[in-house]
């Protein structure tokens, strides 16, 4: 299990990225999504806040779709 966060600020392409604790690209403005076994679960949780969600290329690559 790892703690995941979603960036409160959208990327220039419109999506809000999900990051795992320890990511070098962790945003300062973020919402804690709690503990998740997979990035897929964290992305589902982030969709409660934002409709356009993507995983970080660096720490949640399995969920990065752009």
Label every model-predicted segment.
Residues 31-35, 39-66:
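Short, mixed-charge low-complexity intrinsically disordered segments
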Residues 3-30, 66:
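Short aromatic-glycine-(Arg/Gly/Cys) micro-motifs in beta-strand/loop hairpins
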């Amino acid at each position: 299990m790892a703690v995941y966060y979603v960036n409160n600020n959208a990327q220039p392409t419109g999506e809000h990225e999900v990051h795992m604790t320890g990511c070098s690209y962790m945003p300062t403005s973020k919402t804690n999504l709690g503990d998740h076994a997979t990035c897929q679960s964290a992305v589902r949780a982030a969709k409660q806040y934002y409709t356009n969600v993507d995983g970080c290329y660096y720490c949640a690559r399995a969920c990065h779709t752009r």
